[in-house]
Amino acid sequence: MYTKNFSNSRMEVKGNNGCSAPIIRKPFKHIVLTVPSSDLDNFNTVFYVQPQYINQALHLANAFQGAIDPLNLNFNFEKALQIANGIPNSAIVKTLNQSVIQQTVEISVMVEQLKKIIQEVLGLVINSTSFWNSVEATIKGTFTNLDTQIDEAWIFWHSLSAHNTSYYYNILFSIQNEDTGAVMAVLPLAFEVSVDVEKQKVLFFTIKDSARYEVKMKALTLVQALHSSNAPIVDIFNVNNYNLYHSNHKIIQNLNLSN
């Protein structure tokens, strides 16, 4: 499944003669892929990268899989930091490990609050509307239409009662475009959600529903110098054919960091 998105946004630069010349962003396709994999994957992954960097995005995601407890899908924040610190040609931009929601709130309002927090944790200025629309849709999916995700690998129902539902929900975003420059940014994040409603009702929540929520968020943003791959598509989805730690002498610099 894919949808076409054409950007009409322009930038202007000054030429040698002092005249302005428009820089027109290239059109792009937003493609959603569902592929078989022999590798354990407990993230709801969203990649916003050029094709030659899919390999890198996949293997960064696979690296952070090691921070997830396979028994209960709990995201170990300290383990994630250890993994991040061991990835070459990379740097940690920002981290977050705290409660972010403790209130009775409409889900649509909570989604906007969490989107702003993610923008802050990402630590990069990303101007792509399409990317942020994908982020918003993924956050909505953390709290709505859960009946369609009940058995997915990124969600774990860890405490249920007649008056409360608690679950883990793991997401990973990767972005590489003109805003990130010579690096790829990866943002693994985990929501620990507790809502004062029974599970059967939570499964069918919409963005217009309200409830008492407590949400803890664990996240970090890591950037790694780009290295492209021309591997056949079959090899791209086989982690055994790729080495995340191969030699790369690019230097991480000139990041477009938000304040």
Swiss-Prot record:
Pfam families: Bac_thur_toxin. One of its GO terms (biological process) is sporulation resulting in formation of a cellular spore. GO terms for cellular component: extracellular region. The keyword Transmembrane does not apply. Gene3D superfamilies: Delta-endotoxin CytB-like. InterPro entries: CytB_endotoxin-like_sf, Endotoxin_CytB. GO terms for molecular function: toxin activity. Keywords: Sporulation, Toxin, Virulence. Active after proteolytic processing. Kills the larvae of dipteran insects by making pores in the epithelial cell membrane of the insect midgut. Homodimer (protoxin) and monomer (active toxin). Belongs to the cyt1/cyt2 endotoxin family. This is Type-2Aa cytolytic delta-endotoxin. It comes from Bacillus thuringiensis subsp. kyushuensis. The gene is cyt2Aa1.
